[in-house]
Structure formats: C-alpha cells, structure tokens
C-alpha cells in the first residue's frame, strides 16, 4: 500500500482515479461462463474455481465436520457479538410480518392479501480478505422468518479450499440448509441453472 502525505494539487486528479473495467468485455466473460456451466455443470464450475480462485475443489458441499471445526475456531467474544446482531436483526424483521386482514367486500365475498415465501433461495456471501459474515445474518434471518424452506449459501473458498469459519458459524446459527464452497460468476451461474452438486434456486440474494 502506498501512502501519500500532503500531495501536491497537481497529483489530486491522478490519485482520485479508479480503475475501470470495459463493460463489453465483462459481459462477454459472464455470458461465456454462464453458457459453459449451463452446458457442463459442476465440471465447468470446478474449472472456473481453479481459474479465478486458484484452488482445486473436489466436492463443493460443506461437510458437517467442517462446520464443527469452524465453530471451534470462533472465539466466545465473536460468537456473542454475532448472537447479539442476530437477535437484533430477527427483532427488526419480525416486526415486518403481515397481520392477515380479511375484508368482506360484499355479502359472502372475502378478500385479503397473502404473502408466501419462496421455497428455495440462494444467498451469496463475499469472502476473501474481508469475509462478510454479517451478510449471512442480514440475508438468512429474514429468509428463515419468511418461511423459506431451503436456503442455499455459496461463498468463495480460500487457498486451502475452505470457507471462512465466521461465515460457516453464522450460517449454521441462522438455519442455512446447505453451504457450498464456490464463489464469483460460477457460483451465480450454478445457482441459476443447478448442477449435479449445487441445486437450482428460484431467487438469488
């Protein structure tokens, strides 16, 4: 990391610049990955995980032993902090639940509004240098309260092929039903089309 102290005014524009990505090139890459995964399933997902993340994954599904190991690595302080956050998020979203109200518009005719949960959803949790386990809480908790039966989590693996322990801890705490070690474009494509290892979902958050 470079540090600049009191840079000259002539440098301001250069220092404020951000790298840009050619949208057309990015779109073509995404289309190619999606088409490949739609056609070749998990084989293609493994190929792109190796290419983009630099790690070879044999089985994407997180095992129960991996979750147990992750839980053991989390400090009591962090567990308590996650629990407090989970309780607060639950309290907030519980207050948003609808109270069904039936209206008799004419004699014998009742009308009401009803919300129904999506059966199977996917949640994508960024990993890398700043694993956002808070995103697990903010996505999985309202999904669970809404009544989603299947909550599928995807998060990129590290160089050792593991998901960050805090993400796994938050996932098991909030009732995520399945967890997969896959990230990036390939994770979104896998959730979109489904593969022999990763289920297709109805909506991705």
Language-model features: locations:
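Conserved small-residue-rich beta-alpha loop and adjacent elements
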Residues: 103-169
């Amino acid at each position: 990391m470079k540090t600049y102290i009191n840079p000259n005014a002539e440098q301001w524009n250069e220092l404020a610049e951000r790298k840009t990505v050619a949208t057309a090139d990015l779109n073509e890459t995404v289309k190619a990955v999606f088409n490949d995964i739609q056609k070749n399933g998990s084989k293609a997902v493994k190929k792109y995980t190796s290419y983009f993340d630099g790690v070879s994954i044999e089985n994407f599904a997180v095992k129960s032993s991996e979750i147990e190991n992750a839980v053991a690595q989390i400090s009591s302080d962090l567990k308590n902090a996650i629990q407090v956050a989970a309780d607060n998020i639950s309290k907030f979203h519980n207050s948003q639940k609808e109270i069904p109200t039936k209206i008799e518009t004419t004699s014998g005719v009742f009308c009401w509004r009803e919300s129904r949960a999506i059966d199977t959803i996917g949640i994508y949790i960024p990993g890398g240098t700043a694993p956002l386990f808070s995103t697990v809480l903010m996505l999985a908790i309202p999904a669970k309260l809404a009544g989603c039966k299947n909550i599928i989590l995807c998060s990129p693996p590290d160089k050792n092929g593991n998901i960050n322990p805090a993400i796994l801890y938050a996932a098991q705490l909030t009732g995520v039903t399945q967890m997969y070690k896959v990230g990036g474009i390939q994770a979104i494509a896998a959730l979109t089309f489904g593969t022999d290892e990763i289920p297709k979902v109805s909506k991705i958050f």
